[in-house]
Design a protein with these regions (language model features):
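Periplasmic/cell-envelope proteins involved in peptidoglycan metabolism and beta-lactam response
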Residues: 1-174
Length: 174
């Protein structure tokens, strides 16, 4: 087997043992002529989970899953049933909540570390805001929920402002 399809089996084994997650880049800042930011990306966090891995971590114990969901719901100001649905998904990654304040992200990080959970992730993300409000909004344009430029300078300079995505690779148990 190793000689006939060795490279193929090696690739399959590697894909089964690693999980790749994309890291979204921080969108570039648009400045006025005096160097003041007109469109800025603030650092926020996005919370995600590998449902299959989480169920393995708690050995399928529904009570533990519900406790984790309740604890996260309290931190994230969410409905615990919505979180449970994400825990029960048949996938390797689900978003729990996107673009939460860094303070909330820190609380989730602390909870996850204390509970010894490696399948719940807190990734750095960014959120676009305009410090001058509607000033020059017809020229600046705006971004969508995925931080993609949809109008104005945000759209015209999309390729420059969007940055280059990165990735995190984790080793997972099979």
């Amino acid at each position: 087997i190793q000689f006939v399809k060795g490279e193929e089996y090696q690739r399959m084994a590697y894909n089964n043992q690693t999980q790749k997650r994309q890291i979204n880049p921080k969108r570039g800042t648009i400045y006025d002529r005096n160097g003041k930011g007109l469109a800025i990306s603030a650092s926020v966090d996005t919370i995600g989970v590998n449902p299959k891995e989480l169920r393995d971590e708690v050995k399928g114990d529904e009570t533990k899953l519900r406790t984790i969901a309740n604890d996260l719901a309290a931190i994230l100001d969410m409905n615990s049933e919505d979180i449970m649905k994400k825990f029960q998904a048949n996938s390797r990654f689900e978003f729990i909540k996107k673009k939460v304040d860094r303070e909330i992200g820190s609380k989730v990080r602390a909870y996850v570390a204390d509970a010894g959970l490696w399948s719940i992730y807190v990734d750095e993300d960014s959120k676009r805001y305009y410090p001058k409000g509607n000033l020059a909004s017809h020229v600046l344009g705006f971004t969508g929920t995925d931080d993609q430029g949809l109008n104005g300078i945000e759209l015209v300079l999309e390729s420059t402002l969007k940055g280059v995505p990165g990735k995190i690779m984790n080793e997972v148990d099979v």
